């Protein structure tokens, strides 16, 4: 990865310029296409103006670290005539960067190599309600508020409270029920009897869907 990134950076150092259109492939295999606004050779930071995903009236500004990109391609050279870029709101950029880093850190907290991807998704569903600082892995168990524990296989019957807090337990059980009820049914294996089918389950309405606050202890 490092060698590929280095070769990609070296390839564009002498050929792309401000106003050119570039496509960068990140280390997460995501492609970002945009117009070059600036490039710092020392830090290998490339600033791109990209089409906004939410509105055509605005543009998204991406700061790409080329040292972490697996590929960089110039798809359109600048014709030499381009408008000066607008001044960036540095405070807004710093705030967005901080939020992006926080989201990535929160996602990493949910990772556990010893449990299934489904268990990690359940962890994130619970953390969205309580906050990532209130949820943690204790071995194979999910611990919430340092008092409620969910053990494998992470169903309603596996919820235990060390302080007999029924309010928290019931709320967490509703999260678990909604999580599994809204997951797609497994695809039946080929050759299975046509008469065997799992009943469809519709999501249950609860305080989670309405965004009601977490009950206090």
Curated annotation (Swiss-Prot):
- This protein's GO CC annotations: nucleus
Sm domain span: 9-78
Annotated region (Disordered), positions in chain: 185-217
**Residue spans with biased composition (Low complexity)?**
190-217
Q: Which family does it belong to?
A: Belongs to the LSM12 family.
Name of the protein this chain belongs to: LSM12 homolog A
In terms of superkingdom, the source organism counts as Eukaryota
User: What's the source species for this entry?
Assistant: Drosophila melanogaster (Fruit fly)
